[in-house]
Amino acid sequence: MTELKNDRYLRALLRQPVDVTPVWMMRQAGRYLPEYKATRAQAGDFMSLCKNAELACEVTLQPLRRYPLDAAILFSDILTVPDAMGLGLYFEAGEGPRFTSPVTCKADVDKLPIPDPEDELGYVMNAVRTIRRELKGEVPLIGFSGSPWTLATYMVEGGSSKAFTVIKKMMYADPQALHALLDKLAKSVTLYLNAQIKAGAQAVMIFDTWGGVLTGRDYQQFSLYYMHKIVDGLLRENDGRRVPVTLFTKGGGQWLEAMAETGCDALGLDWTTDIADARRRVGNKVALQGNMDPSMLYAPPARIEEEVASILAGFGHGEGHVFNLGHGIHQDVPPEHAGVFVEAVHRLSAPYHL
């Protein structure tokens, strides 16, 4: 078993005792850091940065040099899987990700390959191996993927969407086609995450960014069902240690009980969910991650500390809390404010673990 100098994050996910509440930030390697912008400029564009193992490793490590974070997260993108299926991913200035060949019908789904993670997605595994080597056992490395539903929204809409009318039209008019796509994505994501674990990821997270746009019934059928399939198929132990799995549905606060039944180890919470309420509902079954509003990092340091204290008090004493933002850090947040946040979590949480 690889010895970790700091395993707080893994211990908290398994609801084991820790000295202070562990903390990391979604999108902690990102555009709010000047050093990230410099490395991205060196790479040329975003996907070139993802596909260069040395540069992906560099940006993964950048926030850890600035802040005493308790975990590193692989620098990559959720759209690597659809890209590897041949949909032609590109980035439009001001528009975000687009696909040249969106999925429009069952025939399109049937033509999609299930990517080999060590072949078409080998660059991701190279990045995982490189990061693990360079971390030198300081903190654990988190691997991740998008959820089948969230990946499908991009693949069917042809890119980002606000109303999700194209995929909802498929969902209601041709549910068979959408289920076929989601099933293929669930198989692909299971292989992809297991390959990340074998390459060295010590925990994994499934990001269901767009699950919250569904009705409760549709969420169960079209999102949660497929995440459950993935959890069932994941390697849960590697290198002599349990590999914890976190599910995060943005806007999914009303479905925590159902999410906790999947067999995952932890649930990510966005900032619209009260953490005390979440702990009452599912804290005996899973750990909780979250959940400060990312926009709070625009506030003065004293206000950030006040919010950290409030969330810590909401969760209360005992184990099973990983502090995080409720979604990704915004690109124009002052880096010093992120530092205030991380330091406050460690300092203010100690009394909750006595």
From Swiss-Prot:
InterPro entries: UROD/MetE-like_sf, Uroporphyrinogen_deCO2ase_HemE, Uroporphyrinogen_deCOase
Sites where the protein binds substrate: 27-31, 77, 154, 209, 327
GO biological process: protoporphyrinogen IX biosynthetic process from glutamate
GO molecular function: uroporphyrinogen decarboxylase activity
Gene3D superfamilies given in the database record: 3.20.20.210
Reaction catalysed by this enzyme: uroporphyrinogen III + 4 H(+) = coproporphyrinogen III + 4 CO2
Localization per Swiss-Prot or TrEMBL: Cytoplasm
PROSITE patterns: UROD_1, UROD_2
Main location: cytoplasm
The UniProt record lists the keyword Lyase: yes
Domain of life: Bacteria
E.C. numbers: 4.1.1.37
GO CC, any one term: cytosol
Transmembrane annotation, as ranges: none
Assembly information from the UniProt record: Homodimer.
Protein name: Uroporphyrinogen decarboxylase
